[in-house]
């Protein structure tokens, strides 16, 4: 089954690579329109998925990732339209020039070909990835989690209907509709057909893909994100940033999971933090110093060492008091996932040092980690947030779904 999907996807990719920007945008507009027109069927499938997931005992954080609402689905359709407005990188000349030999050389952006994406309980990924792949002339094979099986199938049917209406092969966007996990291992060996693989899920999935895949893999999306409250931080805006980074949508990978507090500000800062977190319903996991300083009003539990590596994805926040900037940077290096980290400070020398020494895909000064998102970065919907350094880093927009080829123009030109 998968080999036939690969053959069809590869054939579709050759056709997609030849489309103009206008033709690709018309397809995306049609997909957005169909998502809204077929909203009832998608939401109905999603309700079944959510009910099944709840019966299976999934956490509230996972249920939030899984659930669609009319507003969320409308936002997904709007994201597709936003991709239409983005500049098409395919065909762009990156650089080049006339060589001494007389050969005119240019390096031009081209599609990757076929992209494979393995993801878990995030139904929005189906549309986000499909729209970005189509905009860049790539075909895509999707393998969603069993928790979103019905939602993904309904969504892909809508996308394929739009493709067919625009005269394009339905195989441009395909989903593996069998939830059998053994098919993941088979997909990982489809290097004959898939040019790049992107896993979006937990650490176990990423480890499996890195160890078993014969396809180039881009990993990321696991966010043990930190905020360091420096000794010079302005407390009022710092609290506002922390509340946003923790509570706006706790189930996302750019949510802060560990708060590092400079010891010189701890006694002043921790009590007001506790009050604010109590109002926001956040449970604090405090180290020894925090446990000594705080006695409410926020719910407070002792921090377990293993929790420093946790991606809670819930209203839980580690709070650790550090001696200085060295302690904060050292902690992030040991426990961070190179996703998103921030410093809250009024000392621009410390800000510059933090930015230079924290090796993460996104580093912020006096801002929330929640900005690490393709839409927020002006990239449109994202295919993933890469925490590695090759071939993409941070939110992966359109350019991350392209490669390049060298093209030489001559006039009977030969090498001397």
UniProtKB/Swiss-Prot annotation:
Top-rank EC class of the record's enzyme: oxidoreductase
Recorded GO CC terms: cytoplasm
Pathway(s) served: Amino-acid biosynthesis; L-proline biosynthesis; L-glutamate 5-semialdehyde from L-glutamate: step 2/2
Disulfide bonds: none
Gene3D superfamilies per the UniProt record, alphabetical: Aldehyde Dehydrogenase, Chain A, domain 1, Aldehyde Dehydrogenase, Chain A, domain 2
Gene Ontology biological process terms from the UniProt entry: L-proline biosynthetic process
Molecular-function GO terms, alphabetical: glutamate-5-semialdehyde dehydrogenase activity; NADP binding
Record localization: Cytoplasm
InterPro entries: Ald_DH/histidinol_DH, Ald_DH_C, Ald_DH_N, Aldehyde_DH_dom, G-glutamylP_reductase_CS, Glu-5-SA_DH, GPR_dom
Main location: cytoplasm
Pfam families associated with the record: Aldedh
EC number: 1.2.1.41
Membrane-crossing segments per the record: none
Amino-acid biosynthesis listed as a keyword: yes
Keywords, comma-separated and alphabetical: Amino-acid biosynthesis, Cytoplasm, NADP, Oxidoreductase, Proline biosynthesis
Keyword Nucleotide-binding: no
Catalytic activity: L-glutamate 5-semialdehyde + phosphate + NADP(+) = L-glutamyl 5-phosphate + NADPH + H(+)
PANTHER family: DELTA-1-PYRROLINE-5-CARBOXYLATE SYNTHASE (PTHR11063:SF8), GLUTAMATE SEMIALDEHYDE DEHYDROGENASE (PTHR11063)
Record HAMAP family: ProA
Stated family: Belongs to the gamma-glutamyl phosphate reductase family.
Stated role: Catalyzes the NADPH-dependent reduction of L-glutamate 5-phosphate into L-glutamate 5-semialdehyde and phosphate. The product spontaneously undergoes cyclization to form 1-pyrroline-5-carboxylate.
Protein name: Gamma-glutamyl phosphate reductase
Gene: proA
